């Protein structure tokens, strides 16, 4: 909440109020886990999964990739979306699963542009964004929505579906999860 003291744009009492809504928003995400299980079953043959994002969404991508590797033992990597053109794009082939994280409104269009590049190479796209960003459905093959929140707390919500996806993949491939949920 110290952020509120640093920024004239952010009121600390508003941040406290928003922070108090996070547990309910996490519950709503978990209530939608069957959609992620369905999606995981459709991606049953994925051998490589790439996560892309910009800014803080890149950090979310790193966490999603780590959870995918830790939980399901499926090869995954996270990349800064703007760096795809520097060789990484050559790893994308027909059917490769690419998960684009789009929680930062100012970076949304640029990340969508990178997702379009991946799709042109045959990638199957999953978008992870907030409710209301329905334009992503024009690009992504599957979209997961998280409740709207202050951008300071988007990471707290965005990692939940990625962890659930990793857990669904873990069950699909028959690996035992080493951590308890």
Tell me the role of every PLM-derived stretch.
Residues 23, 27, 62-69, 112, ...:
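Predominant activation on well-ordered alpha-helical scaffold segments within soluble catalytic domains
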Residues 7-21, 54, 101-156, 164, ...:
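Glycine-rich phosphate-binding loops that contact phosphosugars or nucleotide phosphates
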């Amino acid at each position: 909440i110290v952020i509120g003291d640093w920024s004239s744009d952010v009121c600390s009492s508003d941040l406290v109020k928003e922070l108090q809504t996070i547990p309910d928003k996490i519950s709503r995400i978990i209530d939608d886990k069957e959609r992620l299980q369905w999606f995981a079953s459709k991606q049953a043959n994925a051998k490589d999964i790439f996560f892309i994002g910009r800014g803080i969404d890149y950090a979310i991508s790193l966490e999603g990739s780590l959870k995918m590797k830790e939980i399901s033992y499926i090869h995954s990597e996270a990349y800064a979306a703007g760096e795809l053109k520097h060789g990484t794009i050559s790893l994308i082939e027909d059917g490769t699963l690419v998960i684009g994280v789009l929680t930062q409104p100012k970076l949304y269009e640029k990340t969508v542009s990178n997702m379009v590049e991946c799709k042109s190479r045959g990638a199957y796209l999953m978008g992870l964004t907030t409710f209301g960003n329905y334009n992503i459905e024009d690009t992504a093959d599957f979209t997961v929505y998280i409740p709207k929140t202050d951008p300071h707390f988007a990471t707290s919500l965005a990692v939940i579906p990625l962890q659930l996806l990793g857990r669904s993949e873990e069950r699909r491939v028959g690996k035992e999860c080493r951590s308890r949920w």
